[in-house]
């Protein structure tokens, strides 16, 4: 029936989880992407459980992009993820992966300037998603900006000939953090 078919494309409403850790989102996303990710730094903070799916989506995109764009077989891929709480209160997420060596770091970074320049631009994002079937980087923007509603910046590119890094800085993350006193 039409009702059954439409349910295939609707996310099931799961019982809400009160809180989750960064490590939980990493574990779920890395298993889904079939990527081994090492958590190199994790502050002792908890996120509001209603944002688990969105954070897993963000991490999944980062891991899947690492696997599909690195030019390496998955068994040779090395992914590290870290989350740091900055003194000003922002959170910095850094995901790094090894990749096939690039001859010219500057040229390789210039080749992805379009994505950097377009990130956060609603009109360009819609066009890219419609034409290209959706770029992962724009799915990250949608999850963080639209689904979670957190102000953020993103930097990504080749740090060296064999290392690609994505850094997300989330400003004023209090809305996504779990506060026990508020949850009661």
Q: Where does each model-flagged region fall?
A:
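Glycine-rich/acidic phosphate-handling loop/turn and adjacent ATP-lid/helix
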Residues: 49, 85-138, 179
